[in-house]
């Protein structure tokens, strides 16, 4: 059974290794739409794609965009998309950090620091986009009724530059994540190798036991059953003999205990009778003396009562 569990564990670890070894394809497309379609499907990349799609729509500077730029709706939408992107990115980073546990502490700290810096640059770029749009909205509101062509051209230029920065930082972040995941894969491979080394002797023992069982299986089934029956019969006879001997010992012990109890009961009865006789000899004289004193006291009381009730002689005679 232990060998079976060991084999299952090795199979499970091999599956985990295969899962870790999935390649990460770097992004090479320069355009926003191509970048969104070429992503590997990570949640943070999908969230960043939605941010880019929204930025692409803002860059059109259509009439609807111009109307919504005069309200805080665009900045609110961008803030929501930014928060969603950073949240998904942090979750993915935490997942990779768990996979990096077998890696050396120094390597893990360096990779984490580089990834955190790339993450901060991407967040700063998205915040810069939002700030530019807020500034543009304030300037448009201040120039209501005037020509805003120059302002729109300046905003379009800023957004194009910010778009390039976003693409560059996102590509850098993906490369950092690829390095991060490669470190996780390396640590997982080392962990699996160590486990395989520890499980090697167990697997060999299981192989030897399996060979032994196979040699036993070559014996005729009837001979093995007969030998097993004889062993069981001998074992049952031995257990029966021990049980009978033990029962005889218990009977003897019970008889001894009963005799001792009867003897002790007889001794207690004799001691009680002797004690009762002593008590009687102690208290009988005392009781007789108290009876005599009580009788004398009664006679005295009666005499005193009789004397007090006698008639007194009259002086007139």
UniProtKB/Swiss-Prot annotation:
Q: One GO term of the cellular component aspect? A: extracellular matrix
Q: Where is this region: 8 X 22 AA approximate tandem repeats?
A: 80-255
Which segments carry the region annotation Specificity for association with VLDL? 278-290
Q: Residues annotated as region LDL and other lipoprotein receptors binding?
A: 158-168
Methionine sulfoxide occurs at which residues?
143
Please list the residues that carry the modification Phosphoserine: 147
Predominantly, its location class is: secreted
Biological process (GO), any one: negative regulation of platelet activation
Mapped sequence repeat ranges: 80-101, 102-123, 124-145, 146-167, 168-189, 190-211, 212-233, 234-255
Give the start-end ranges of region Lipid-binding and lipoprotein association: 210-290
Write down the Gene3D superfamilies for this protein, in alphabetical order.
Apolipoprotein
> Looking at the record, which segments are called Homooligomerization?
266-317
Query: GTP-binding among the record's keywords?
Result: no
Where would I find glycosylation on this chain? 212
Q: Where does heparin bind?
A: 162-165, 229-236
Q: Name one GO molecular function term.
A: tau protein binding
Q: Which family does it belong to?
A: Belongs to the apolipoprotein A1/A4/E family.
Q: How does it assemble?
A: Homotetramer. May interact with ABCA1; functionally associated with ABCA1 in the biogenesis of HDLs. May interact with APP/A4 amyloid-beta peptide; the interaction is extremely stable in vitro but its physiological significance is unclear. May interact with MAPT. May interact with MAP2. In the cerebrospinal fluid, interacts with secreted SORL1. Interacts with PMEL; this allows the loading of PMEL luminal fragment on ILVs to induce fibril nucleation.
What is this protein for, i.e. what is its function? APOE is an apolipoprotein, a protein associating with lipid particles, that mainly functions in lipoprotein-mediated lipid transport between organs via the plasma and interstitial fluids. APOE is a core component of plasma lipoproteins and is involved in their production, conversion and clearance. Apolipoproteins are amphipathic molecules that interact both with lipids of the lipoprotein particle core and the aqueous environment of the plasma.
This protein's name: Apolipoprotein E
Q: What is the lineage of its organism?
A: Eukaryota, Metazoa, Chordata, Craniata, Vertebrata
